[in-house]
Amino acid sequence: DLTYWGLGATDHLVTAWIALSEVNVESGCMQFVAGSHANQILPHEDTFADNNLLSRGQEIQVQVAEEDKTDIVLRSGQVSLHHGRMIHGSGPNSSEDRRIGFVIRYVSPDVMQEVAQKDYAMLVRGVDRARHFVHYTPPPSLFAPSHLALYEEIREAKKQAMMAGASKSSTLYD
C-alpha cells in the first residue's frame, strides 16, 4: 500500500479492514504473507487490468509461493490489521454473496504526504504537532453540503497522490 499512497516508507501506519459481510476463501478473502512488512517497499507494476479494483491495477513484482500466503477469513464485524508494507491481496469473489469491507487507516501525525500537495485526516487521539494533514471533522448531518464539497477536495487530493507518476489515468476518480 505504501508504494502508491505517497506517504513514504513509514512504520507509523496501520490499516484496519473491517468485514461487513462474511469473508472466506470462496468470496476472495485477503491473503497476507507473514513477515513481509519487514521488507523495504517492493517494486510494483501498474497493470490497469479490468479485473483489478485498485486505482492503477497495482501488482508487486515478486513471486509469492502459495504456501507462504495466509487466508484471512473473517465473520461480519471482525477486523484484520496490516502494515502498509505487508504483501497482501485477494482473489476473485466466486461465491453467490457480496464481499463487503470498510477500511480505516491509522496514521501517526508525523507521517507526511510526499507526492500530493496536501492530504487529509481526522484526528482521533492526542495532539497533532506536526500539522502535515488538513484536519476535518465528521459531517454534521447526512449529505451536509459543506462536507460534500470537502469530500470532493479529499477525492482530488487522493487522486493526485494515487496517480502520481502513472502512465495513464484511472476511471476510479471520475
Predicted features along the sequence, with ranges:
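Short clusters of hydrophobic/aromatic residues that line enzyme substrate/ligand-binding pockets
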Residues: 5, 30-32, 124
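Double-stranded beta-helix
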Residues: 25-91
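Non-heme Fe(II)-dependent double-stranded beta-helix
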Residues: 1-8, 45
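Conserved catalytic motifs of the protein kinase core domain
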Residues: 13, 28, 99
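Non-heme Fe(II)/2-oxoglutarate
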Residues: 85-87, 91-174
